[in-house]
Amino acid sequence: MAKEELLEMSGTVLEVLPDARYRVTLDNGHSLVAYGAGKMRKHHIRIIAGDKVLLELSPYDLSKGRITFRHIEGRAPMTSRHQKR
């Protein structure tokens, strides 16, 4: 079975929840619960309230997401999935 296409959205972390989860508000106003991707945990990338993040959402469940990138002030934003390696 092929991997389904994921939706990429950007948002802002509202609060840090227990068990390495985060409450995130998307740019369109929708709120959801997200967790950090495995590589973010592996490289100890910390996410705090107020951070701008890039998320992947499944088209089947829009209430949960995976944080794949944390934007850093002063760095140009990533716009495409093809720029990551």
Curated annotation (Swiss-Prot):
Principal subcellular localisation of the protein: cytoplasm
InterPro entries documented for this protein: NA-bd_OB-fold, RNA-binding_domain_S1_IF1, TIF_IF1
Localization (cell): Cytoplasm
GO terms for cellular component: cytosol
Coiled-coil positions: none
Keywords: Cytoplasm, Initiation factor, Protein biosynthesis, RNA-binding, rRNA-binding
Origin: domain of life: Bacteria
Location of the S1-like domain: 1-72
GO molecular function: ribosome binding; rRNA binding; translation initiation factor activity
The protein's assembly and partners: Component of the 30S ribosomal translation pre-initiation complex which assembles on the 30S ribosome in the order IF-2 and IF-3, IF-1 and N-formylmethionyl-tRNA(fMet); mRNA recruitment can occur at any time during PIC assembly.
Similarity section: Belongs to the IF-1 family.
Protein function: One of the essential components for the initiation of protein synthesis. Stabilizes the binding of IF-2 and IF-3 on the 30S subunit to which N-formylmethionyl-tRNA(fMet) subsequently binds. Helps modulate mRNA selection, yielding the 30S pre-initiation complex (PIC). Upon addition of the 50S ribosomal subunit IF-1, IF-2 and IF-3 are released leaving the mature 70S translation initiation complex.
Entry protein name: Translation initiation factor IF-1 1
Organism of origin: Azoarcus sp. (strain BH72)
Name of the gene: infA1
